[in-house]
Amino acid sequence: MQTSPLLEHLIESLRCLPGVGPKSAQRMAYHLLQRNRNGGMELARALTEAMSKIGHCSHCRTFTEEEVCTICNNPRRQHSGLLCVVEQPSDIQAIEQTGQFSGRYFVLMGHLSPLDGIGPKEIGLHLLQKRLQEESFHEVILATNPTVEGDATANYIAELCMQQNIKVTRIAHGIPVGGELEMVDGTTLTHSFLGRRQLG
């Protein structure tokens, strides 16, 4: 059966979303056309507006509609002296939801991966270095992912910080709350032992 070129284009466009394969994209397209045309129109409007108006903060590189995001513009955070380095803008959202961090951020938009052609320049480490030189931070907290690439990225940034005599720490990685030891992989368990804290 030959389908409409517009329908085919819609299905193909939906496939750009993470985790959406041909079948899922087809289900979404048919759902919007059959049962939720208003929702589809609203989605199209929201996508168009977001794509044209959302850019990157000139200080931390997270997503924002302004030149400088609300976190970087917050005077209380400007005087905290803390900078948290994350891989993705979504990492900021996750950290903010904990309510445990009151400093500022720098978003790498990825991690070092030489095999994929991603070096220091591609993740903006020259911008991070400039920021460390121009602003007064007394501690940089590295919140990169606990992967080989995340570790390599954290080690590279740690060197930059130490060259400027800035204290550098890495968020702890270990056993999740409610997790059972027998289900935890060896690398995570090793991190848990290395990152153990004294009680009392």
Curated annotation (Swiss-Prot):
SUPFAM superfamilies, sorted: Recombination protein RecR (SSF111304)
ZnF region ranges: C4-type: 57-72
Annotated Gene3D superfamilies: 3.40.1360.10, 6.10.250.240, RecR Domain 1 (1.10.8.420)
GO biological process, alphabetically ordered: DNA recombination; DNA repair
Domain Toprim: 81-176
GO molecular function, a single term: DNA binding
Keywords, sorted A to Z: DNA damage, DNA recombination, DNA repair, Metal-binding, Zinc, Zinc-finger
CDD domains with a match to the protein in the record: TOPRIM_recR
Family: Belongs to the RecR family.
Function according to Swiss-Prot or TrEMBL: May play a role in DNA repair. It seems to be involved in an RecBC-independent recombinational process of DNA repair. It may act with RecF and RecO.
NCBIfam families linked to this entry: recR
PANTHER family per UniProt: RECOMBINATION PROTEIN RECR (PTHR30446:SF0)
Listed name of the protein: Recombination protein RecR
Organism: Pasteurella multocida (strain Pm70)
